[in-house]
């Protein structure tokens, strides 16, 4: 009997719950269709929105805090392994081994204490704070269901009140029929029964309305008080949580700093006792910096003449590459210069060497000179003039030009238009080949008034080739015809050379810094990264000078002074500096 009773109670409860769900669903449908009004509380809805926002922020903070704790634990494990590695490599006979082991143990304990305090003062507090949200969330949902029940009971009661007159008409109609069929005494009892039944339904609907309203108001009042209070409590919770985290982290780093200082003292004492075995870390140059060492210099950019080991632009012999030290001298990290970003490499034009056939072709009758404006040519004085101190010192009267079928060779390969050449008569039969003719004096008149320094000795091979190309009978004719250049040609040639005879010690050298080698022009902007570097802009002209100490020169770097600074200050020590060679182009 007890089992049957419990089953009946359970079945009745289930039926009641199903009935409530159906009633609520019906009420929501009517509200959505607009056939039933809905009770709304805008203030409470705002509190619910704040509650959902607060729950979202708290959940995110809890997730991030757990991630932070996981990172602390991982850092603890990494620090522990590093300390164990130090203990393993620390030899027993080394001083300070016990201190190092103690520092490692304290380091491990400090990490454990930091992690545990974070869990106690931050994570557990966060869990407690978020623990109240599920209960309030369920109460908000229950309050919404009770509001639907209240609206349903209210609508049912209002419908009974509205249908009161209709029910009375339905009750009166059967009475009129009964009056004809039933005796008089039965009609009064039947009417009283129908009225009592209608009143009972109305009373039940009213009781349900009052009950639903009471339950809803109780829950609504509680939530109206708790939700604003919970929303305002978030400020204090955030402050306490982050203050705890910041304080714990500050204390942790202070203690860790002390341990690291103690470990550093132990290692310093170890280094002092093993000072002879100090390991020096050598910095490696970066990929984008110009490499340093004994490597071949980078080829010059387009438009600049390629210098050969025999003859340079200033007609000074260039030291052979074999004279450089064979091994790279290591430098301290302070001496290693980090190079600037490498600009796009220019296209390189391979230098052309003068072959013997080409030298011989200069004296051939079929040789047609061409004008070359891209590469300034270097003037090489003919053999007879190279032994003289100055061309202006030749005190010979010029001879009138005479026709000669022999074409005068161009100085140092300088191209001169064919129409500017004038035929002269050969003086081979008149003047001896060993004596300088007066035609040489006429040739010297067209040159600028500069005293030529004795140039370096030319290679033996070139001398033999030139000497072999001219027979004894043709030597005097060639010397005579070399002076037959008109004044216009001579002036054009000297303007093209533009002071290429770098060996002269005239007035052109007075405005140049001591040890001047050549000029370069910046092709790209370069920002100086050190006090001893030059700040360059595209188009700046730099006067290149040698390093005071050749061992300090790094591969890819040159020493120089900007031409504008030199012309303004004339102070080499203050104006000079180093700059990357690949940012410039040689112009002279």
Swiss-Prot record:
Which InterPro entries does the entry mention?
Answer: AH/BAR_dom_sf, Amphiphysin, Amphiphysin-2_SH3, Amphiphysin_2, BAR_dom, SH3-like_dom_sf, SH3_domain
Subcellular location(s) per record: Nucleus; Cytoplasm; Endosome; Cell membrane, Sarcolemma, T-tubule
Indicate yes or no for the key word Cytoplasm: yes
- Region Clathrin-binding, as annotated, extends over 379-422
Q: Which residues carry this modification: Phosphothreonine?
A: 308
Report the Pfam families cross-referenced here.
BAR, SH3_9
Ranges for domain SH3 come to: 515-588
The record, for SMART domains, names:
BAR, SH3
Q: Which tissues does the record link to its expression?
A: Isoform 1 is expressed mainly in the brain. Isoform 2 is widely expressed.
Q: Which residues carry this modification: N-acetylalanine?
A: 2
What residue stretches are annotated with the BAR domain? Answer: 29-276
Q: Which CDD domains does this chain map to?
A: BAR_Amphiphysin_I_II, SH3_Bin1
Record PTM: Phosphorylated by protein kinase C.
Q: Give the start-end ranges of region Interaction with BIN2.
A: 2-122
| Record GO cellular component, one term | I band
Q: Where is the composition biased (Low complexity)?
A: 474-484
Q: Which GO terms describe its molecular function?
A: aspartic-type endopeptidase inhibitor activity; signaling adaptor activity; tau protein binding
Q: Which residues carry this modification: Phosphoserine?
A: 296, 298, 304, 324, 332
For this UniProt record, the keywords arranged alphabetically read as follows: Acetylation, Cell membrane, Coiled coil, Cytoplasm, Developmental protein, Differentiation, Endocytosis, Endosome, Membrane, Nucleus, Phosphoprotein, SH3 domain
Span list, region Disordered: 279-355, 448-484
Positions the record marks as coiled coil are 15-42, 193-274
Task: Give any single GO term for biological process.
Answer: negative regulation of potassium ion transmembrane transport
Task: Identify the PANTHER family for this entry.
Answer: AMPHIPHYSIN, MYC BOX-DEPENDENT-INTERACTING PROTEIN 1
Subunit-structure text: Heterodimer with AMPH. Binds SH3GLB1. Interacts (via SH3 domain) with DNM1. Interacts with SYNJ1. Interacts (via SH3 domain) with DNM2. Interacts with CLTC. Interacts with AP2A2. Interacts with AP2B1. Interacts with MYC (via N-terminal transactivation domain); the interaction requires the integrity of the conserved MYC box regions 1 and 2. Interacts with BIN2. Interacts with SNX4. Interacts (via BAR domain) with BACE1. Binds (via BAR domain) F-actin.
Q: What does this protein do?
A: Is a key player in the control of plasma membrane curvature, and membrane shaping and remodeling. Required in muscle cells for the formation of T-tubules, tubular invaginations of the plasma membrane that function in depolarization-contraction coupling. Required in muscle cells for the formation of T-tubules, tubular invaginations of the plasma membrane that function in depolarization-contraction coupling. Is a negative regulator of endocytosis. Is also involved in the regulation of intracellular vesicles sorting, modulation of BACE1 trafficking and the control of amyloid-beta production.
Q: What is this protein called?
A: Myc box-dependent-interacting protein 1
| Organism expressing this protein natively | Mus musculus
Upper taxonomic lineage: Eukaryota, Metazoa, Chordata, Craniata, Vertebrata
Q: Which gene encodes it?
A: Bin1
